[in-house]
A protein has these predicted regions:
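Amphipathic alpha-helical interface elements
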Residues: 1-79, 83-167
Length: 167
């Protein structure tokens, strides 16, 4: 399958970025607890993955509605489309593991090691977020999640806008 190239002007990209930031803020800005932030961001990122698949695949809607795909499988389908970068995909897989640890073990405590597993694939921003958080795990988590979800939203909203499916 040939990888599709998307062409967008600087103004279109600026508008897409603005839409992504507004959308993320509407879902995640009021979440205070680190655990709730992780869970809410996971739900939102899953929605973004579904929208991405529906927009990119001719029968994507049927796949999402009838396929009973797990989060991990949705990441794999998104990766198979061939547009998203591998670092983002790796980070999403590790993010899902962290969410599963929290969701399936009520006594589980989120750790910096878990955060690093999904922040390191994001590149240099991982170290920047560690420094900016000044030792506060909750703040480092917030910065990392916002960046992770923003990157995913960027891909999703870009293809939705360029295909005319963004609402």
């Amino acid at each position: 399958m040939e990888q599709r190239a998307y062409q967008a002007t600087k103004d279109e990209l600026s508008e897409i970025n603005k839409c992504a930031i507004e959308e993320i803020d509407s879902y995640l800005s009021e979440v205070g607890s680190p655990v709730l932030l992780l869970l809410q961001a996971h739900l939102y990122s899953e929605n973004l993955l579904e929208r991405y698949i529906v927009t990119e695949l001719p029968k994507g809607k049927k796949l999402i509605e009838k396929g009973r795909l797990t989060y991990f499988q949705k990441v794999q389908v998104a990766g198979a489309i061939g547009v998203m970068d591998n670092n983002l995909l790796s980070s999403l897989v590790e993010f899902n593991k962290a969410r599963n640890n929290l969701a399936h073990n009520l006594n589980h405590e989120f750790t910096r090691e878990q955060l690093k597993k999904f922040s390191l694939p994001l590149g240099d921003v991982s170290a920047e977020f560690t420094e900016r958080a000044n030792g506060c795990l909750a703040e480092e988590l917030r910065l990392t999640i916002n960046h992770l979800v923003s990157r995913l939203a960027g891909y999703t909203i870009t293809i939705e806008k360029l295909s005319g499916k963004y609402s």
